[in-house]
């Protein structure tokens, strides 16, 4: 029997080590059991990677993180090559251990008080016009990291007054009142929180999260700021059905959410949850049509769509798939 892992502060636990810490266990996927990727899931890498390396260098120089790298996003090359990135604040170690996610789990260190300033300067240097700020879950902080979000928003706007800011926030479990009080005083231009999947599979996919809590977070922010778009995203391919996805879309509309993203789940490693199915582009088109019929102002639905994929285009209502 292997010894239980004793977490050390500041150490990243990934793959088998991370999964060993999850109460709901996953079965390691053997290579022969992996679903073959269909043709529509093949990615063509850009010929010129100089812009990609430039953005990575800027991140390293300022001690910043991107969710693009930490979560092994399949769109990293495309987004970096276009000069866009989703910044991940509050460190690169998450207090949650979701078995679909490639972000490291562990005991995070104290938030960097200089991060808002460094982030704002980096964004100004890159001359970005639209930026997405997300974070790991920080259940170790009394406000879940809400004040750090607010500090980052203020610092960015001070350096780049015309920029549009989208925040992709955690669920602030047990801290919603405190977090919303802070965020309501310094709101973003788009407020995003992902449901990730359907309630039936939450115990397996999002241990530690609560479907109704996440809906309430989105609803309460919208009630306080009816003029600000609220947004949420889901992955498909984790055992849900299309009918269940449509029902979640209805729940989102009932809670005031106006923007939607749907994308294909991809297994980061054989230790993570396996892909149960690949949803075809035609099915994504059908779900987008259903979303628009429900009254979403924008729905980005496609195999490679992620919550922050071409977020600037999503905010403008342009086609993204």
From Swiss-Prot:
Mind listing the UniProt keywords for this protein, alphabetically? 4Fe-4S, Cytoplasm, Iron, Iron-sulfur, Metal-binding, S-adenosyl-L-methionine, Transferase
EC supergroup of this enzyme: transferase
A Gene Ontology term for the protein's cellular component: cytoplasm
Write down the superkingdom of origin: Bacteria
Q: Which residues bind [4Fe-4S] cluster 2?
A: 94, 98, 101
**Residue runs in coiled coils:** none
Q: Which InterPro entries match?
A: Aldolase_TIM (IPR013785), Elp3/MiaA/NifB-like_rSAM (IPR006638), LIAS_N (IPR031691), Lipoyl_synth (IPR003698), rSAM (IPR007197)
> Pathway of this protein?
Protein modification; protein lipoylation via endogenous pathway; protein N(6)-(lipoyl)lysine from octanoyl-[acyl-carrier-protein]: step 2/2
The UniProt note on the cofactor reads as follows: Binds 2 [4Fe-4S] clusters per subunit. One cluster is coordinated with 3 cysteines and an exchangeable S-adenosyl-L-methionine.
Entry protein name? Lipoyl synthase
Provenance organism: Erwinia tasmaniensis (strain DSM 17950 / CFBP 7177 / CIP 109463 / NCPPB 4357 / Et1/99)
Gene behind the chain: lipA
